[in-house]
């Protein structure tokens, strides 16, 4: 799941306010649409910048039930709400889109033995990500640090 690390969102937790999302609401949602993915692509760079500036964390985990889940702080949830999202939906799309990119890039190598934190991705979601792959990759690529 190197892609999650490319998102710049993985790492050890720094704050005790970070909590796992509810497994009943995070990945037990309908597949995302192309419109939702495009909005996610538009909002992700600002969220990544906010995460970095505020030293927050948001990343996939395996919950107590052994299922893929997502860990994010109340502050991150508040930022996402202010951007017009339901946090559970934003982080669901984040996890599924990252998993779809991993499937596209690694194919059978990852689908035969997926990492335990990797959520299931529907065929429709995989197709939507394929159609929007250049924009998604641009949104998740690390921003180069300006040289002084």
Show where each model-derived region lies.
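Bacterial N-terminal signal peptides that target proteins for export
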Residues: 1-8
């Amino acid at each position: 799941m190197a892609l999650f690390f490319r998102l710049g969102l993985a790492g050890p937790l720094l704050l005790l306010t970070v909590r796992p999302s509810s497994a009943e609401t995070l990945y037990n949602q309908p597949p995302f649409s192309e419109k939702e993915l495009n909005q996610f692509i538009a909002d992700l760079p600002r969220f990544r910048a906010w995460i970095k500036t505020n030293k927050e964390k948001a990343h996939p985990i395996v919950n107590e039930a052994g299922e893929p889940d997502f860990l994010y702080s109340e502050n991150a949830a508040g930022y996402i709400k202010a951007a017009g999202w339901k946090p559970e939906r934003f982080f669901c799309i984040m996890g599924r889109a990252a998993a779809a990119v991993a499937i596209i890039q690694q194919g059978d190598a990852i689908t035969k033995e997926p990492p335990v934190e990797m959520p299931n991705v529907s065929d429709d979601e995989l197709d939507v990500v394929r159609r929007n792959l250049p924009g998604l990759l641009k949104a998740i690529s690390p921003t180069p640090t300006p040289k002084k």
